[in-house]
C-alpha cells in the first residue's frame, strides 16, 4: 500500500509509526480476507475518518463509468509550493508536456466524500487522480503497461508521498485499468492538452467560466473551519456502516408503477447506470445542480442484477438536449446519451 497525506494536514501515523497521517502498507495485513486488494490503496490522512481504506463492499460495473473529459481551465491553477514530511514540492504550472513511467496505486472508501487538495469532493466512482506536482486541476492519460488499458483522469488532489508511487487513482480508475485487486501497477502517465484533445475530435473546446473571486473568498473560511474540526478529532477504529456489508441475495422487486408514471413524450438522456443505489443518488444530486431538466432514477433488472439508471427528461427539443449534454460534460459528470423511455 502506498502512503499518502494531504498537503494541508500533518497527521499521526497509523500502526504506531509516529508522525505523518498516511495510509500504511504495513496495515494491510490486518485485512486478512483481502490482503492483495489492500496492498495498493493509499489516501490523504484525515483525523475525522477511520484509518483503514478499501474498495466498496458492493460490485460496481466500471465499464459504465466514462473517462474524465479534458476541459480548458479558465483561471488560476493550484500550483503553490508545499511541504509534506519535511520535503518541499514545487508543482508545475502546465501539465501538457508531462510524461512519466512508474507505479500507480489507488484510494477508496475512506476518503469518499472528503475534500481534495483543490477543494473538490473525492468520489471513488469518479475518474480522478492525485499527483505530487501536476497543477490542479489538470488531465492525464494513464496506461497500464501490463495490459495496455488506458483511461483519462482529472488530477484534483495531492499524493502519494512515499516510495516509488507516481500517481494515486480513484477506485473506479484503478478498476478500469485492471489493478484494483492487485493494488499497484506499472503505468505511463501523459499530460493532455484539452484544446488539442477537442480539436482532434473536430470540435472546439467548450468555454468554461472562471469561479467568481467572491465565491472563492467566501469558501475559504468555511474550508479552514472544516479542516480545523477534522484535525481535532481522533482516529477511529474502522467499522463499515451496516449498509456497506455484503447481504444475502434477495428477490428484487422494482416499482413498475413508479417507472411507468414517467412522461413518455419528449427526449431522454442517460448519464449512468449503477448496481449501487447510493452511487446513483449521488450522481442524481450532482446533475440536479447543473441542469434544469428533470433528473430521475429508473431501476431495472438485467442478468439477475438490479441497475439504477440515472436519467434526465423529458427534454423538449434536440437543441435543448445538446445544451444539456454540454452542461453535463463541462461539469465532468459523464457522457450523456439519448435513450428511449421505458
UniProtKB/Swiss-Prot annotation:
EC number: 4.2.2.-
Residue ranges annotated for the SPOR domain, each copy included: 261-342
Sorted UniProt keywords: Cell membrane, Cell wall biogenesis/degradation, Lipoprotein, Lyase, Membrane, Palmitate, Signal
Keyword field contains Signal: yes
Bilayer disposition of the protein: Lipid-anchor
A Gene Ontology cellular-component term: plasma membrane
Residues with lipidation of kind S-diacylglycerol cysteine: 27
Residues lipid-modified (N-palmitoyl cysteine): 27
A Pfam family this chain is assigned to: DPBB_1
Broad EC category: lyase
InterPro entries: RlpA, RlpA-like_DPBB, RlpA-like_sf, RplA, SPOR-like_dom, SPOR-like_sf
Subcellular compartments: Cell membrane
Record-level Gene Ontology MF annotations: lytic endotransglycosylase activity; peptidoglycan binding
Signal peptide span: 1-26
One annotated GO biological process: peptidoglycan metabolic process
Function: Lytic transglycosylase with a strong preference for naked glycan strands that lack stem peptides.
Similarity-based family: Belongs to the RlpA family.
The name this protein goes by in its record: Endolytic peptidoglycan transglycosylase RlpA
